[in-house]
Curated annotation (Swiss-Prot):
Keywords from the UniProt entry: Chaperone, Cytoplasm, Ribosome biogenesis, rRNA processing
InterPro entries listed in its UniProt record: PRC_barrel-like_sf (IPR011033), PRC_RimM (IPR056792), RimM (IPR011961), RimM_N (IPR002676), RimM_N_sf (IPR036976), Transl_B-barrel_sf (IPR009000)
Role this protein plays: An accessory protein needed during the final step in the assembly of 30S ribosomal subunit, possibly for assembly of the head region. Essential for efficient processing of 16S rRNA. May be needed both before and after RbfA during the maturation of 16S rRNA. It has affinity for free ribosomal 30S subunits but not for 70S ribosomes.
Cystine pairs: none
One Pfam family per UniProt: PRC_RimM
Organism: Ehrlichia ruminantium (strain Gardel)
Annotated signal sequence range: none
Any one cellular-component term (Gene Ontology): cytoplasm
HAMAP family xref list: Ribosome_mat_RimM
One Gene Ontology molecular-function label: ribosome binding
Domain PRC barrel: 92-167
Family classification: Belongs to the RimM family.
Protein name according to UniProt: Ribosome maturation factor RimM
Length: 172
């Protein structure tokens, strides 16, 4: 998919025998998953109805025209996208994960530190994985204003203030 689309979730497995599916959502609130309209995998458009919110990022859903477990199984690992223009406008200092991935990470002294590779959330906060400059190694840091002091999505960079515990002589 191109940058005009954002992945809102992925179908992880069938659920039951009636064609329901379990979906891992990437929305802040799983109940918002279907609020923006029909979703697509890039080929097919899906109308989805939430049956149950299972956890903070998992729902059980019914997809129109999917009526059996066999049909639902064919959708396993299918990513579901929405046009970015259908999403609500963000307030200042809010970002979609897809807008941050690929941004160059620059230290406060203007040295290049790396590139944002991926964003995770293990419960307490978002974690930014950074692929280190001129290396195959990566490191992870919490996504906070104290650490990522400036974010410029238009010019595709962030400014990183390394936490005191890490420092610039730690070998990262």
């Amino acid at each position: 998919m191109n940058s005009d689309f954002i992945c809102l979730g992925i179908i992880t497995s069938p659920h039951g025998i009636k064609g329901h599916v379990k979906i891992k959502t990437f929305t802040e609130n799983p109940q918002n998953f279907t609020s923006y309209g029909k979703l697509t995998d890039g080929i097919t458009t899906y109308e989805i109805n939430i049956i149950q919110v299972v956890s903070k990022n998992t729902i059980i859903a019914k997809i129109n025209n999917i009526t059996s477990r066999t049909n639902a199984e064919l959708l396993r690992n299918k990513k579901l996208f929405i046009e970015k223009t259908k999403l609500p406008n963000l307030i200042e200092n809010e970002f979609y994960h897809s807008d941050l991935v690929g941004l160059q990470v620059i230290l406060e002294d203007n040295n290049i530190f790396g590139t944002i590779k991926k964003i995770y959330n293990f419960g307490s906060c978002d974690i930014i994985e950074i692929l280190l400059y001129n290396s195959k190694k990566s490191t992870m840091l919490p996504f906070s204003k104290d650490i990522f002091t400036h974010i410029n999505t238009k010019e595709r960079y962030v400014i990183l203030k390394l936490p005191e515990i890490i420092g610039s002589n730690s070998g990262i």
